Amino acid sequence: MKKTILLLILLTGMIFHGYGRERIDGGVNDYKNSIKLTFLSWISGSTKLSYERALPQARQSSELCASWIGAGRDKYQNDPKGFTVRYGHKFFFRDHDEKSLQGWYLRPEAIYSYYNYDCNSSGNKELADMGALLGTAGYQLVYNRFLADFWIGAGYAFGHPSETKYHHGFELWHWLGKTNDHLAMSFSIRLGLCFCIFLTLHHAIIQHLPT
């Protein structure tokens, strides 16, 4: 029975190994998955974690990011508590090696931010409830298993803004002496690791089998 279970696990790993990780010219591993942390998000009052998955047979990927607002340094001293979720779809330009998760890209995004905070002007607890549709452009670098993602973008925002204009995923225009609650800006850096999800699971199961 134990040999049968081991055989099934090995076969499953062989089937999914090629889908989660391939080799390109020069024998370099081409990972299809990554998990990332938004660099410096903690100092602005939140912790952001992202998962990205390359799509098979296409220079595209899907990316989902979740943010816990309040898990970080209280930059504006207003005790924010809430969350942000965002989804982006990357369209990569072709490059010389065509790693699935590397290269220049364009990314349309949808973001929703919801949190309560202490409003300095009213002295009450207020709600910031905002959504945004953005277009971003950036570059993602992959080195072995390590990944760095840099981007900047802008788009249309809607909802009930906070007095700081910062929504832990995008910021409303409030520079040059002007404010615009419908113009959202986004720019940041994400750092992370690439991996093969099925191969990692396969190894973990084998290690925990009884001997």
Regions found by a protein language model. Name each.
Residues 53-146:
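Gram-negative (and chloroplast) outer-membrane scaffold detector with strong preference
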Residues 49, 87, 135-137, 152, ...:
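Membrane-embedded beta-strands of outer-membrane beta-barrel proteins
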Residues 41, 53, 91-93, 139-141, ...:
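Residue-level signature of outer-membrane beta-barrel architecture
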Residues 29-33, 43-47, 79-85, 102, ...:
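Residues that define the transmembrane beta-barrel architecture of outer-membrane proteins
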Residues 86, 181-205, 210-211:
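Outer-membrane beta-barrel "beta-signal"
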Residues 4-14:
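Sec-dependent N-terminal signal peptides
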Residues 40-42, 65-69, 109-113, 153-159, ...:
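Outer-membrane beta-barrel pore domains and translocons
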Residues 21-31, 56-59, 94-103, 142-148, ...:
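Short loop/turn motifs that connect adjacent beta-strands in outer-membrane beta-barrel proteins
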